[in-house]
Amino acid sequence: MSRRAGTPTAKKVTQLVNVEEHVEGFRQVREAHRRELIDDYVELISDLIREVGEARQVDMAARLGVSQPTVAKMLKRLATMGLIEMIPWRGVFLTAEGEKLAQESRERHQIVENFLLVLGVSPEIARRDAEGMEHHVSEETLDAFRLFTQKHGAK
């Protein structure tokens, strides 16, 4: 019974997982959050270079909705990681490793977006939702999304 007399308590639907599983789940989420910004930046740099011929801090700040100092700080981090090269007065360029990461991120996004479209989500919402989901989906789940999409007819 619940605290209110006469009202039965609802059964618990889920059980608490063991400690190791719980820890691993939270570790994976933290790792996904860490990778999320990195992926977004390298993908944006790649897109800007492809679409407008250059990637400038001012353009990145505008598209990400952040300040230029925030972009500058992240670019230093990406350079330290070996993902980009910054050339004064010329812009930001991806290294081979950075371009590979951008391509992988773009593919993950497309798989998730196509899956959402097959489910009937509108194109605008599918694009937006995929932007957040792509970073938090395992390879196994991506493979399942890809297979489902192929079976049910999308791009």
From Swiss-Prot:
Domain of life: Bacteria
Family: Belongs to the DtxR/MntR family.
Lineage, opening ranks: Bacteria, Pseudomonadati, Pseudomonadota, Gammaproteobacteria, Enterobacterales
Record text on subunit structure and interactions: Homodimer.
HTH dtxR-type domain location: 34-95
Protein name: Transcriptional regulator MntR
Entry's Gene Ontology BP terms: negative regulation of DNA-templated transcription; positive regulation of DNA-templated transcription initiation
One GO MF term: DNA binding
Pfam hit, one: Fe_dep_repress
Keywords: Activator, Cytoplasm, DNA-binding, Manganese, Repressor, Transcription, Transcription regulation
Subcellular location: Cytoplasm
PROSITE patterns from the UniProt entry: HTH_DTXR
Xref: SUPFAM superfamilies: Iron-dependent repressor protein, dimerization domain (SSF47979), Winged helix' DNA-binding domain (SSF46785)
Listed NCBIfam families: PRK11050.1 (NF008273)
GO cellular component: cytoplasm
Organism the protein comes from: Escherichia coli (strain K12)
Comment block on domains: It contains an N-terminal DNA-binding domain and a metal-binding domain.
Function statement: In the presence of manganese, represses expression of mntH and mntS. Up-regulates expression of mntP.
